[in-house]
């Protein structure tokens, strides 16, 4: 399966109330820690219009390097197709239930560069979930 790496450079909006990127690193790590303590059902979000669910699978914080590695999972459901045995060409029928999903994984690497810049390396794939959906997922908690 083809995967594409996309780079985002996020600039922290600066005003007298803005946090520095390193403080954002600590806050975001704490957020992911709290989120990962929830049951998988509680941290799952449904993207009904796309027939997908999305959830935080895991993350790793490399504190000395100011790097967060995040693994998100998604699953597309409501897609039920007839399955055939490609050797015998006999139909095996529909093997999935309506709620069964095809699981995909997206990885993100976040590097907190300095007080104002966060570099994000996002692994994109056609069947996975987009970066905007992941940001929306985080904002929903």
Locations of the language-model features?
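Intrinsically disordered, low-complexity polar/charged tails and linkers
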Residues: 1-109, 124
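A short acidic, glycine/proline-enriched capping/turn motif at secondary-structure boundaries
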Residues: 77-79, 115, 127-129
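Glycine-rich, often proline-containing surface loops adjacent to acidic residues and nearby aromatics
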Residues: 111-123
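A short alpha->loop->secondary-structure connector
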Residues: 117, 128-141
């Amino acid at each position: 399966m083809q995967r594409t790496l996309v780079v985002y450079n996020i600039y922290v909006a600066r005003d007298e109330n803005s946090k520095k990127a390193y403080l954002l690193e600590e806050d975001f790590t704490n957020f992911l820690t709290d989120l990962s303590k929830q049951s998988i059902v509680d941290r799952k979000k449904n993207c009904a219009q796309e027939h997908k669910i999305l959830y935080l699978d895991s993350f790793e914080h490399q504190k000395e390097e100011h790097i967060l590695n995040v693994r998100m999972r998604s699953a597309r459901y409501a897609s039920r197709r007839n399955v055939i045995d490609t050797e015998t060409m006999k139909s095996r029928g529909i093997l999935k239930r309506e709620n069964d999903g095809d699981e995909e994984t997206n990885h993100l690497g976040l590097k907190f560069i300095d007080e104002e810049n966060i570099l994000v390396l996002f692994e994109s794939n056609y069947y996975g979930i987009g970066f905007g959906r992941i940001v929306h997922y985080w904002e929903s908690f």
